[in-house]
Amino acid sequence: IPTGIFTLPEIGRVGLTEQQARDRYLAAGKDPQQSVRVGRFRYGGLGKAQATGDIQGLLKVIVDAESDRILGVHILGAHATDLIHEAALAMHLGATVSRVAEMIHAHPTLAEGLMEAMEDVHGHAIHLARKPSS
């Protein structure tokens, strides 16, 4: 069930948190480090976020490493309560993270961030915004 928290910034979430996923695999006798993959993408890497000034935010995807199925998605940032529904639909349909990452997203949009976070699960995101090094 997708959840929206209408704070500033907004929070959108669906499915398991990273810790919940790791705990479940550990309880099942599996190595949580090998069983769970995580992809992240910062709003700062999105052209739309740059244009609107909404660069503070993060999209996080939690995935079953063996099946590539999405276990949870968490978004913190502008329009997170709207963006979470694409992830909820993908999970409802049993889509793999690879299938969602392959879907073409309009540019420039905040929704591209979900695609990039999905791509990051397998190290394929190309627009990652890195924290400045000191």
Predicted features and spans:
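Flexible, glycine-rich terminal cap/loop adjacent to redox cofactors
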Residues: 3-17, 22-134
